[in-house]
Amino acid sequence: MEVNPPKQEHLLALKVMRLTKPTLFTNIPVTCEEKDLPGDLFNQLMRDDPSTVNGAEVLMLGEMLTLPQNFGNIFLGETFSSYISVHNDSNQVVKDILVKADLQTSSQRLNLSASNAAVAELKPDCCIDDVIHHEVKEIGTHILVCAVSYTTQAGEKMYFRKFFKFQVLKPLDVKTKFYNAESDLSSVTDEVFLEAQIQNMTTSPMFMEKVSLEPSIMYNVTELNSVSQAGECVSTFGSRAYLQPMDTRQYLYCLKPKNEFAEKAGIIKGVTVIGKLDIVWKTNLGERGRLQTSQLQRMAPGYGDVRLSLEAIPDTVNLEEPFHITCKITNCSERTMDLVLEMCNTNSIHWCGISGRQLGKLHPSSSLCLALTLLSSVQGLQSISGLRLTDTFLKRTYEYDDIAQVCVVSSAIKVES
């Protein structure tokens, strides 16, 4: 009859504890009316309780700290800290002790041990302590694997390990929206506005230390989350930048292409990288967390082969008096164009000059500026339309209507220049 040998107990004991900040101790006040049967008994007990604040015993306030009673929650962007202790519970000396701590995520395995060198010996009732730190960068299941190997006095090599599983949760819900800027000089400009909606998904308030946008090399960014009051820059969220649980806050940024990219047509088109958000916050007792989004992308507006924009136009003009505008024509294609300009009158707008004139060849990513003259025969807000550009190489015509709007007033009203 075969008998299984008894399982050998290890000489060393492994303990793993998570290191977190303590919390403020709060008591539940129990009180009653003075004429009730207990009288002043409950009130006296609260006054004698060392965890209460004198004069505010019934407000659930406390000045004492309490250690965490459970593992708690771990959120993405926080620093996971753990205390690892290996204690010699036996009465003999153990040699060649090696403690290794690995963190297994869904995508990788990380070594968190501060040192990979073995300890020569460990006497009875002595211990080996280590503290590990790791900035959590993935959500989902994480497994802390602690392995211990050692050699007994008899020369037998022993090995054991323990697994500690925990979940990493998402602290913030970040949503982004892009808005193309609208200008008086062009129906679509290269400026883009980014709205970032940040929601606190935890169960405790957050102090938002920093929410910034790190732009890509093509853009300059301007934050629009503050206003000027009495010569000082004041946040639109007030002096206390706290974000309560499940609350949402909107941050706004304006991005404008740098000059070296804005002057080259065709570079900023299609899917372009805008940048990434860098968010830093603090929770209870100053525990810091940091989260960086992936590169934000947006679909740049399409201009077609030829882009027409206005560089200069007056806001108000006199009725039946000529005024001047400056147009910029940009070749956004990858081929050379031979352009002809045609000007078609409308019911209210009349072009002055020769229609059908040759503009010459326009190479890829190059531009030319045109000064045009026109007048309006109708008062009110008038839309400028009727420009036609024809590429003689492909016999293709590009139409431009509703380019801009101008306010036409009576000639008796003096227009400020």
From Swiss-Prot:
Quaternary structure and partners: Part of the multisubunit TRAPP (transport protein particle) complex.
Underlying gene: TRAPPC13
Species assigned in the record: Homo sapiens
Biological process terms in GO annotation: endoplasmic reticulum to Golgi vesicle-mediated transport; vesicle coating; vesicle tethering
Protein name as annotated: Trafficking protein particle complex subunit 13
GO cellular component terms listed in the entry, alphabetical order: cytoplasm; cytosol; TRAPPII protein complex; TRAPPIII protein complex
Family from the record: Belongs to the TRAPPC13 family.
InterPro entries: TRAPPC13, TRAPPC13_C, TRAPPC13_M, TRAPPC13_N
